[in-house]
Amino acid sequence: MKLGVVPENLPERLALWLGIPPPGIVESWLGIMASRVVMAATKLNIFESLAAGPLTAAEITTKCATHSRATEQLLNALVGMGCLYVKGEQYALPRKMRAWILADGKYSLRGQILLRYLEWHWWEHCEEYVRTGQPLRLHETLTNEDWDVYQRGMRAGIEFPANWVARKLPLPKTARAMLDIGGGHGFFSVALCRRHPQLHSTILELPQAIRHAAPLLEKERMGDRVRYVEGNALTADLGVSEYDLVFMAAVVHHFDEATNRQLMKRISRSLCPGGIVAIWEPLRQDRKGSIRQLGGLMNLFFGLFSEAGTWSAAEIAEWFRHAGLEPCKPRRMWFGPDLTLHVGRKPA
């Protein structure tokens, strides 16, 4: 997946072929506008107003309690982006958008789009981070309201990757106990437990995260098969030979290498013989010449707001070996920012 400039005629195609303008120039201009347009339309319920059918600009203005001329400008921007289309004097939501953009859509990303407002603010720290190397350490500074937006954003659209992980994870049929470190909204645990009826999961999470994630988990009606335990992954007692599976989704990019190595040792001790640890993470390319757009951006983003950044498959495999675990071949999702499932197995 890559963000780029799409030429609309022959002269534009020729200009791009000649490197006019060079990469990044147009993207930095159009990207900021396009992003804010979708964010505003989501926050102001423009998309929701069209859930029941096409409306005129005046009708949308009335439903959303917005300014008439400014609303029409926003609507036309959305048409230009392909997010809406015009039907006579009315604006309509394309069928392909409904499942993704509406609050009750099957793959709704509404919560994730609203999270962009927090991320917009976080990116203002980019220059300071590059100058000093000091990250934001967001998990230490998020307000109560921010935690709610953050958890809803993390939950939005996670069904596809969670179900993919549940299908691809080589979980032993005898597995009964799972530890989900930093599992937040809990849907990875939900997907795995639904696929493996004998499995029960404990989600180890910070108390401030649980406060806002628990209502999201309750909607899945998993009863006592998926439960929360308050604690910090870096200091909590993980036990000895207690779990058949220890799972972490988008966790290790928060920690530096020394911390991840130490955490992996503690996870190894907590695994039963034959048990597995699974890490689902965006992958950093091993060779600088092979860095792709989204991979490079994600590495900077995670470094900016947390402690470290993304890791390569070779680095994660080395953590496994250092902890006495046998690395399995990583499995990369066909869709997304090089999202990869890394598995290490404890000898039986």
Regions found by a protein language model. Give the residues of each.
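Conserved Class I S-adenosyl-L-methionine-dependent methyltransferase catalytic core
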Residues: P11-L16, I20-P54, T62-A65, R69-R176
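Core SAM-dependent methyltransferase catalytic element
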Residues: G324-A348
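C-terminal alpha-helical "lid/dimerization" subdomain adjacent to the S-adenosyl-L-methionine
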Residues: W280-A323
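Conserved adenosyl
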Residues: K106-W280, R284-G289, P337-T340
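Short, hinge-like loop/turn segments at secondary-structure boundaries
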Residues: K219-M222, L294-M298, P347
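Compositionally biased, charge-rich terminal segments
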Residues: M1-A15, Q285
